[in-house]
Amino acid sequence: MAKIRIHEIAKELGYDSKEIIEKANELGLGIKTASNAVEPEIAAAIYEYIQTREIPEAFKKNIKTPTAKKPKKENIKEQEKLNESEKKEPKKEEKLKQEVKKEELKIEKENAKEEEKQEIIDAHKPQSLASATLAKRRGLVIVKKKKDEEEIQVKKEEVKNSNDISINNEERLSLKTMFSNADESLKKKKKEKKSFVASKKESTEKMNFLDEHDFGDISLDDEDEVVLPDFSVKEQEKPQNINKKQPNFIRQAVGNSAGFGLEGGIQRRSRKKPSKKIEKKEVEEVGSVAISKEIRVYEFADKIGKSTSEVISKLFMLGMMTTKNDFLDEDAIEILAAEFGIEINIINEADEFDYVKDYEEETDEKDLVTRAPVITIMGHVDHGKTSLLDYIRKSRVASGEAGGITQHVGAYMVEKNGRKITFIDTPGHEAFTAMRARGASITDIVIIVVAADDGVKPQTKEAINHAKAAGVPIIIAINKMDKEAANPDMVKTQLAEMEIMPVEWGGSYEFVGVSAKTGMGIEDLLEIVLLQADILELKANPKSFAKASIIESSVQKGRGAVATIIVQNGTLTIGSTVVAGEAYGKVRAMSDDQGKALKEIKPGECGVIVGLSEVADAGEILIAVKTDKEAREYANKRHEYNRQKELSKSTKVSIDELGAKIKEGNLKALPVILKADVQGSLEALKASLEKLRNDEIKVNIIHSGVGGITQSDIELASASENSIVLGFNIRPTGEVKERAKDKGVEIKTYNVIYNLLDDVKALLGGMMSPIISEEQLGQAEIRQVINVPKIGQIAGCMVTEGVINRGAKIRLIRDGVVVYEGNVSSLKRFKDDAKEVAKGYECGVGIEGCDDMRVGDYIESYKEVEEQASL
C-alpha cells in the first residue's frame, strides 16, 4: 500500500501537523517534517495513540514509559467473587443493571443543557492533544458521579456486595444490548429532527454511530465514572477566527468502518482540492419572494434557497432543458414557484432606475391650468393629411417632402380663436407603423383623414386601431370633397362596418367633410377639435418639473443631437437638466416649428431642443431633474442595464427551433450599413428591410445610425464582404466618397423610402438562385431503329410536333413513361447533317448514351430557360 504523509493524518484528525509530529516522536518514530510518509500500519498506530492515549503493543518495547499501576489484589479478588455471584444470580443482577441504566439516562437528560453549553465553549477554544486527559470513544460520554446521586449509589452498593464494580464480559454484552435497544428510537428522532429553522445556528442532528462498532472492549478503572451512550452529538458552527479543525471522527467512521489499524485498512485522502462544504441551511418561511422578470436559473435558486441542481432537475421533469446561466421566462418562474410551494412576486428591475416613475406630478388644484390640446393627424398615404395641415398652417410642407409623401413626424403649433393647438403629422406609408403608433399614444385627439374618392384603405384601418388602443377620441375628416368622384356616404358606410358610426346616424363619432385644396370645412373641423378639448378638460401644472415626449430626434451639423418634443406637464426652460433614456444633458437652445428661438415651452406646446448627449430614441419620455449628477446616474444605469440585457441573451433553443436555426445559418445574406437623417425614419427602414426575406435570402443590417455617412462606416463596409452603404435623406461628403472609391465600397442614397426598398429587393433577387423553367420544342415518333457498328443505335423518326434541334435536351418516352433523358448527339436529313428538322419531315436521330430505342417510342425535345427570381 502507498504510504501516508503526516499532514494527511493531521487533516484527517483535524489537528495541527506539529502536534502530530510530537505524538509520533513520542512513539519513537523520529518524524521531522509534515511531508514525511509512514506505512499504513504506523499511521494506524498514530491514530490509535492520539485517540486512546494508549501506546500500541508494537511500540512499548522501544519506549520507556512509566509503569502502569497494577490493580490491587483486593480488586482482583473482588472481581472474581463478582463473577461467581453473577453466575449464581444472573437474573437479579440483570434487573439491577437495568435500574442503573435507567437512572443514569435520567441524570444524562438533566445535565444535557449544561453539557451543551460546555461543548459550545470548548468549541471556541483551540484544541490540542495535550488537553485530552482521557480517551473519548466515538458515541460515548463519561459522566462523573455527583454527590447528590444518592439513588444510583444505593443501587450500585447492592451490586458492590461482591466488592468493586468492574465491567466483565457479560456487562459488555449488556452494554451492546442497551445500544441496540436505543437504535430504533434514535433513528425515529433523526427523522423528526430533519425539519428545523435555518436561523438556528446549532444543529441538533443526531448521528447513527452505533452501526459496525464494537463496544465490547470498554472498561473503566475509575469507580466514580460511568460510561453512557452519547445521543446528543452536535455539529457546532466554528467561529470565523478559529482556523484549527475539530477531529473528523465522523468521516473516519463513514469512510472506513474498521478504522486505522483494524481490518479494512486505511482510507487515503484524495490529492484533489477539497470541495467546499456547504452548510445545510433551511429556508426561512417567508410570505413572498421578490423575483426579477429577467433572472437566470442559478439566481432563482439562490432567491428561493434551493440548490441549482434541484431547480434544473425540476425544469427537466417539466420538459425544459436548461443550464444554470439560462434565463427563465415568467411562465417558467410561476410554474417553479408552484412546484416548490413558494409564493413569489415578479418585479421588474428596470423600475429601480425608472425616472418616469420617480417623477411626481403636482396635483394642487390651484396650480393647474388649461393646456393646449395635442392633435394627431392619421390616415392612408396620399389621402391629404399633410395638405390639410398645410392649409391650417398656411404653409407648403407637403411640397417639400420627397415624392410628395410624408416621411417624418412633424409637430406644429397653430392658433384658433386665441387658443393654441398642437398638431402632429404622421406618415401614412405602411413602413411607418411605429411612428403612427407613437403619435396615437401621446395625443389627446386623433383626426383620421379619409379620401372621399378612395374610401377606407389598409393604413386607415391601422390608424383607427392605433387610436382605439390609445383610448383617445376620434374625429373623421372626409377629405377631397371638391372632387367630382367624391362619395362621402361610401366612406361612412365602410367606417360603420368598423363600428365607427357617424353622429347623424345615431353614433358617437364626428364626421366633417373638408377640402385641403379649397379650405372647405376647415373652420368647422377646428371648432369641433376645440369643443372636444373642452369636454376632455385638459389641464397641467406649469410650475412643476417638465415632462415631455420625444416625437423625433436627429443629428444636425453644428448643433449635435436635437429632439422634437411635446411638453405634457411642467415648463421646460433653457438651462434645464434633462434625461431621456440613455441621453441626458442641459437644454442649450430651443426653437418652435418655424425656427424661432424660444425661452420656454409650456404644457401642450411643441418645440425643438438642443443639448442632449446623444440621439434619444423616438418615443422616449424626457424628464427635467434637479442636478446633472442625478441625470447622469439615470442615463448610465439605463445604459448599463440595456447593455447587460443585450450581452446576456440566452442562446438556448428548443428542438423545434434547432432546425430553424440550422436553416437560418444556410441563408444567403446581403450585408447593409444603414444611415438616416432622423431616428423615426431609421426605425421604419430597419423594420421594412428586416421583412425582405424568404427561405433563401435575407438582409443583414450590420450597423445603423442617425447622421451622415462617415469614414468609419466605409471602413466597416470594406471589412464586410459584398456589403453596401444605404443612406436615407443624407449625402456623403467628398472625403467619404474618395474613401469609398479607394476601398471599393458602394454607396447608395435615397430620399423616397419605397425607392430604397425596391432597389434592395432587386439586389436580393440577383443573389437568389434563378428560376429554371422548361420550353417544349417538338416531338418525334420512332418508326425504325438502325444499329450502326461502332456508333450505336440510330432512330428513324417522323417529326410530329414543333422542331427537333441538334444538341437539344430530349426525353425518350415509352408508353407514356420517361425511360431515358439525354441530349441529341446527331441529327441528319437523308445523308446530310441538319441543324433542325421541322414538323412533317423525317430524320435520323442519335441519342447520346442510349442503346435501348424501340419502334413506337417518342422523342420529346425541350430546352431549359432561366429566369431571375424576385421577392
From Swiss-Prot:
GO cellular component, one term: cytosol
Compositional bias annotation for Basic residues: 61-72
Molecular function (Gene Ontology), one example: GTPase activity
Chain segments carrying region G1: 379-386
Family of the protein in this entry: Belongs to the TRAFAC class translation factor GTPase superfamily. Classic translation factor GTPase family. IF-2 subfamily.
Function recorded in the entry: One of the essential components for the initiation of protein synthesis. Protects formylmethionyl-tRNA from spontaneous hydrolysis and promotes its binding to the 30S ribosomal subunits. Also involved in the hydrolysis of GTP during the formation of the 70S ribosomal complex.
Protein's UniProt name: Translation initiation factor IF-2
Naturally occurring in which organism (per UniProt): Campylobacter jejuni (strain RM1221)
Lineage: Bacteria, Pseudomonadati, Campylobacterota, Epsilonproteobacteria, Campylobacterales
